[in-house]
Structures are given as C-alpha cells and as structure tokens.
C-alpha cells in the first residue's frame, strides 16, 4: 500500500469505524466513546544536507526526511487530525551553524504545510546545532506556545504538556558545544511550572518529551530525572500517556496505567517504506489508541 503498511490498514480503518470493504467494524467505538482529540506525531527526522550513515551502524537517511515528513503531513491533513507534534531532533547538527539553520528552515516549511496547529519538542541534536533561542524563533508553535521551548496547551478537555530536557542536572542549559545525549534533565524552573500545570488540569493529561521517561532506555536514552517524573505523574492521577523519541528503535511500557510510548525514528532506513509516524486518538474514558504508519507500532491502552 502507498501510504501505510498493510499490517496497520485494518486497525487504522477500524479506528474510524470502517473496514477495508467500507462496512462498520465490529469493535468500532460507541457514540459516547468517540475520540475527544486526535493528533499526529513523529520524531527524530534528523534532517540535514549530509550523507547517510551506513552499516554496521544504524542507517540514518538525513536528506530523505524532507520527503518522509511530507508524507506524514499529507496523511495527517487527509485524516483531519486536530494538531501535529514533532518530538525532537528535527534537524541533524552540521559543523556550520548557517547550514544547520538552512536545514531547519527547509524542514519547518514541510511541517508548516499542515492545515492546523503545530508543536515542537527540543531534542539534543537540535540544541547541538542551534541555540535554544534561535530554534524557537525559527519554528512556529501554535497559540501561546509560540517562542517557547516548554509549554502546555489544552484541546477538548485534554491538557498537553511539552517538556524541555535540554539541561544538565546542575541547571546549565545545553547548546552548541555543550550537549550530552545521555544527560537529559529538566530545569528547576520547569519542575515548579510542571507541578502547577498538573494541579490546574481539569481532565486527562498527555506529556511530550524527547528523552524517554520510562526506565527501559538504556545508555542515557531515559532522562536522568525520569524516576521522579513518573512519581509525579502517578501522584497526579491525571496523566494517561507519555510520548517520546530519542531511542530510534522505539519501545512501549505501561507503568501504573500510564502508557510510555517511544516512537521509532523517521530518519532510520532509506525509502518511504522506512518512514515512521502515528496518529493518536484519546477517548473520554482516558483510553489511548495509537495507529502506527509504516514502521511505527500500533498500541491501545486504558488507564
């Protein structure tokens, strides 16, 4: 199939109440269990004018990410999702800051083709390429999130929280010449802010980050303060999902009823058949349904 893998077609169709033959699926949602919000998500495009890495290492097809992102945006436009979000490492760092900025402007143009709100999460490669202030100035988050690296927004009773783990444990911000992919950490100010957002949230909460927040990210793939964060999420009783990137091969864990979904990297592998992105549906009960496209895994969980 052109826009998604065959293994995901039936699940995707059923998510919208139709089978491949156009008939109602047996497990389609009841009228009172329609999604309250749907969004598209991708991560780790690592776009840049750089040659692909080759085996035995992971193949990162840097230049191809513009075409892969175009497919993602076209698909989400056709699905009419409420918004889209990228989970970091939008660009691959280049020795030349000017070339890194040119890459960011190019991939942002593709991202901005979406007919609705768009949001960004900062990754370690973004910060290695471009200072935080310049990155947020050259990208366009929707609404009050514009010009911010960490922020929250609400859509149809669901609160979404975007975290910026681009700090060292001593509070020093990461940036060009001072990044470490194994040492992601929130700033002190963000912890105070996070407590306030969770306290104010009146419904379900979904968290976006670049670093993983579950305990299974080996070798620095999980944020250093993830244990503390999971306790905060559990105590709030409001968080139903955490979406992250950073670990290019993806993963999923359910801890205390919270789904920790790590999306596979868009840049991994050559050709559109090696693309990776997903559509997420959130239901009134807190059920979360992830419909994976191409290499992305499909998952469903309930709190």
Map each language-model feature to its residues.
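N-terminal active-site segment of His-dependent metallophosphoesterases
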Residues: 27-98
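Extended active-site neighborhood of metal-dependent phosphoesterases/phosphodiesterases
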Residues: 31-33, 55, 59, 95-200, ...
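Histidine-centered catalytic micro-motifs
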Residues: 207-213, 240-250
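Alpha/beta-hydrolase fold active-site loops
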Residues: 37, 82, 150, 158, ...
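Short acidic, glycine-rich surface-loop motifs adjacent to enzyme active sites
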Residues: 199-217
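Active-site glycine-centered loops adjacent to acidic/histidine catalytic or metal-binding residues
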Residues: 44, 88-89, 123-124, 210, ...
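N-terminal secretory signal peptides and thylakoid transit peptides that target proteins
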Residues: 1-20
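Short, solvent-exposed loop/turn segments at secondary-structure junctions
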Residues: 49, 93-94, 214-217, 222
């Amino acid at each position: 199939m052109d826009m998604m893998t065959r293994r995901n077609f039936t699940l995707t169709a059923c998510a919208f109440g139709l089978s491949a033959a156009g008939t109602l699926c047996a497990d389609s949602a009841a009228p009172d269990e329609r999604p309250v919000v749907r969004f598209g998500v991708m991560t780790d495009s690592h776009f840049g004018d750089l040659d692909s890495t080759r085996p035995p290492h992971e193949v990162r097809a840097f230049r191809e990410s513009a075409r892969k992102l175009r497919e993602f945006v076209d698909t989400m436009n056709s699905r009419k999702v409420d918004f889209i979000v990228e989970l970091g490492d939008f660009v691959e760092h280049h020795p030349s800051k000017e070339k890194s900025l040119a890459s960011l402007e190019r991939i942002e143009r593709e991202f901005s083709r979406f007919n609705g709100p768009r949001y960004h999460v900062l990754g370690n490669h973004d910060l290695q390429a471009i200072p935080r202030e310049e990155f947020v100035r050259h990208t366009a988050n929707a609404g009050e999130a514009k010009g911010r690296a960490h922020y929250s927004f609400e859509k149809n009773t669901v609160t979404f929280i975007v975290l910026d783990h681009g700090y060292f444990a001593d509070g020093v911000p990461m940036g060009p010449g001072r990044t470490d992919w194994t040492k992601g950490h929130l700033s002190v100010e963000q912890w105070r802010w996070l407590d306030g957002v969770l306290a104010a949230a009146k419904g379900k909460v979904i968290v976006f980050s670049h670093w993983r927040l579950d305990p299974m990210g080996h070798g620095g793939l999980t944020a250093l303060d993830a244990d503390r964060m999971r306790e905060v999420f559990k105590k709030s009783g409001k968080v139903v999902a955490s979406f992250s990137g950073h670990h290019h091969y993806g993963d999923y864990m359910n801890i205390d009823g919270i789904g920790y979904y790590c999306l596979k990297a868009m840049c991994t592998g050559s050709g559109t058949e090696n693309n990776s992105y997903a559509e997420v549906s959130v239901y009134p009960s807190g059920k979360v349904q992830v419909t994976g496209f191409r290499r992305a895994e499909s998952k469903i969980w309930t709190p």
